[in-house]
Amino acid sequence: ETSPEDIVGMQVSQGILTVRGGMTSHAAVVARGMGTCCVSGCGNDNNVAIDYDAKVITINGHTFHEGDWMSIDGSTGNVYEGQIATVASTENANFKRFMGWADANRQMKVMTNADNPRDAQNAVDMGAEGIGLCRTEHMFFAEDRIKAVREMICARTVEERKAALAKVEPFQEADFTAMYRIMGERPMTIRYLDPPLHEFLPTKAEDIAALAADMGMTTEELNNVVVSLHEFNPMMGHRGCRLAVTYPEIAEMQTNAVIKAAIKVSAETGKMITPHIMIPLVGEVKELKFVKDVVVKTADALIAAAGVDMKYEVGTMIEIPRAALTAGEIAKEADFFSFGTNDLTQMTF
């Protein structure tokens, strides 16, 4: 199965095939968002064997080596040996006409999820009227920035953490700049760092040793950090807004990147960019207020220094039951709400 750490490989894949999983698994959800063909949960340990060292996979007695062709059908879940001839899908004329009638009469805007400039361009091409969720953590896994992210996580002092964040900020700013150029004045809601930190750390011994050497730590010291950050229950653990409460410099860095990008694109295009900043996993109004204060202080200083008149909004996602129950109090500090129905459903039932 896949995890957030696999996002770079998934982005360059022509198709995704996993042994474990289903329609709502990580592989299926991410592939659907990227428009990549995916078959998730194709079997079990009895009919699928994977030799990672030899780069060989055996499915129901059929063996595939690295470089061999296989074809997958995301609609039926079928997996075929060899390369099957395909044609690009086309938009049905009757469907296009029907959707035109719907567009002429609807009163609801349809947005999409997009985590990078490529997704944003696809969204615009497909007629999306905005980005309802941009998950910034997916930007962190790129090969050119994951090292700095890991240095930030394993930092022993605030100074070390800020130095690592200073390396990450230009990458985030570049991503947001590219996305704002594509989206123009269409709304884009940017969710701050959400997953628990252990998801960004290396798991292979050689990667841990390399990171330890880069940071001037022993492998044992770094292993202790990795173990200390491991979450017993990642859904409810040290993640979301709790990361920004513990390490406000993370929220400060992300605010720098968002606002600088918005100011730059507004100046370039003359369009009014209004950043929508989402603080994730809030369950109590004090959490939102703490992080919002960091965001507002940072954003206002940047806007004043640039001498521009820029509006921005700070909101949150209602995704845990406590947030739903205290929504009236949270609303006093939030400019907007989004609903995270997947986590909310799992925590409720």
Describe each model-derived feature in a short phrase:
Residues 91-97, 101-349:
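Conserved alpha/beta-domain cores
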Residues 1-134, 138-152:
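Acidic, glycine-rich flexible loop/linker segments
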